[in-house]
Amino acid sequence: GLGTGLTMAAMMGLAAVASATSVPLADVLGDWSRSLLVWTPLAALALVVWVPVARAAHRHPEREEVPEDVTHALPWASATAWLVAAYLTAQSWQFYSALAWLAPTYEAHGWTAREAGLLMAAFTGAQLLSGLAAPTLLDHVPDPRLLLVLAGLLGGAGELGVWLAPDTAPWLWAGLLGAGQGAAFALGLALLVRYAATPRDSARLTAMAFLVSYTAAAFGPAAMGVVEDVTGSFSLVWALLALVMVPQLILSLRLRPDLARVGAQID
């Protein structure tokens, strides 16, 4: 739980910094492409740090006794795997759509690009905090449904706020949206471990869940963009995202702690 939270905090923390500084950097450097180049050294540093780790892992693989009849196939026949994949699909569709369209929504309401960038920083900053807290709390809660539903309600409140009263409390809506999405995603990552019988089964579950959820969620931003093009407004976009939260909440309630683990069943 804590490891998942720290990973989320690192990702969202740097994303918040990038959101807040990219537009000012573009103003200073005179071009948005130069602003993006500023982040190249960080990517290069990550590569430099990771290469030795990958080489060491390849030279000294962990010794694990694997039964001869162990399966490496994805758990397509597992009902638990499909529940987790469906949950992550609903969450990812909303997250990537919000990531793509929150700033343009407020630019359409008269905000400058810099102001919209700061709003995105608040959105990702809230994800940092909730993404760190949620999986840590999950370690101390026997039933994940309470945290899953709470995350969904926070995110849904943010979506409803942007839809129904976008100019009333935009910073609050961005914070609620970020807190809900950050917690929901971090909890989803933790479920990939909780609902697996072994680390090897967790890898199988993760591969299947990510294949399903990211393939479906990749269409989210584009589909919401089509809605905006057709209607000429972002209002219906946020109404639809709030509607997608309904199946996420239903799936959250079905993720009981006593579900059969992937690998502990024939899948």
PLM region spans:
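Helix-to-loop junctions at the C-terminal end of transmembrane segments
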Residues: 130-143
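Interfacial helix-cap and linker-helix signal at transmembrane-aqueous boundaries
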Residues: 17, 21-30, 106-107, 137-138, ...
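A late C-terminal transmembrane helix in Major Facilitator Superfamily
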Residues: 199-234, 241
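Structural signature of the two symmetry-related core transmembrane helices
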Residues: 146-160
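Helix-loop-helix hairpin linking two adjacent transmembrane segments in secondary transporters
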Residues: 5-58
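Extracytoplasmic gate region of multi-pass secondary transporters
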Residues: 79-122, 126-131
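Juxtamembrane intracellular "pre-TM" segments in multi-pass secondary transporters
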Residues: 55-84
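Intracellular juxtamembrane helix-capping segments at the cytosolic ends
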Residues: 183-197
